[in-house]
Amino acid sequence: FAEFNRYTNSPVANYHGQIYNLPFNMNTFNKMWGVVTPAEAKAKIEEQKAAAGITDPQNLEEQAISLVGTDIYEKLIKGYTGKQWGRPCTELPAFIIKRLPVRFTYDNNYFNALYQGIPDGGYTAMVEKMLEGIEVRLNVDYLADRENLNALADKVVYTGPVDAYFGYRLGALQYRSVRFETEVLDTDNYQGNAVVNYTDAETPYTRIIEHKHFAFGTQPKTVISREYSTEWKPGDEPYYPVNDEKNGALYAKYKALADAETKVIFGGRLGEYKYYDMDKVIEAALDVAGKELA
């Protein structure tokens, strides 16, 4: 369906005008502390971890400090994560931060995957080819007409909010939404990187995306999108779940209801109320398809 380019995700963080490499690696540690070797970086982290007295992290703040020390937490995690989730790091579970890779090498590649890239021509072109010969109905509210739509198939794949499927009968799960502010700029290169995270608490947006760098564009102008993380409310598009203890307990009840729906497959971030990266959700979809078609 598509050829892929060689794009490798290597975001950077901007903290009050200071640029740090992501994921946290030796380039980050060198900029932060002036350390040169992995042993020096590990010693600095252990020193800060010991000073904080953390042995059993109970929340995201403690988990982050135990992974990368106080300085990196304060400058590169605290403000950004607070904006992303809309609540202080002390109120978020420790496991969220485990998604952030930490490396003691001078490697700015965010992912460890052997193959990386973005479809030439973009994802829209790829999906259009995938949908050739398939009937697509747009602007259809499945939940408002599920009886008629269910009659069209033996199995239904539902990727909407799991609580909405059951009419919020057990209460509403919490989600985060995202608002994008896109602008065309009369310059050929605005920030020099596809993704720049703004990790201070004062900057209202979480990051700026400069789209041309995903495809190594050479256009005379550039398009940027500022990304704002917002609290979800009915009518907004939910982007990702709030995986804290309260919502996890409520989702477990909805999952029991979902498991009883033998004709419906619940999938994706919203259907499974799970923070999925793209590669993992595609892998999960292929696994389910393989089992269903076996």
Model-found features: residue ranges?
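Pocket-edge structural micro-motifs
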Residues: Y15-G17, P23-F24, E210-K212, R226-T230, ...
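A short alpha-helix-loop-beta-strand transition element characteristic
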Residues: F1-H16, I72-K75
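Short catalytic/ligand-binding loop motif for oxyanion handling, primarily in non-cytosolic enzymes
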Residues: V12-Y15, N21-L22, Y73, Q84-C89, ...
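Mid-domain catalytic core of redox enzymes
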Residues: V140-L257
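C-terminal catalytic lobe of FAD-dependent flavoproteins
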Residues: E237-A294
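General small-molecule cofactor/ligand-binding pocket signal
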Residues: N5, E135-N139, I265
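Active-site/ligand-binding neighborhood in enzyme catalytic cores
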Residues: Q18, P23-K155, T159, D163-F166
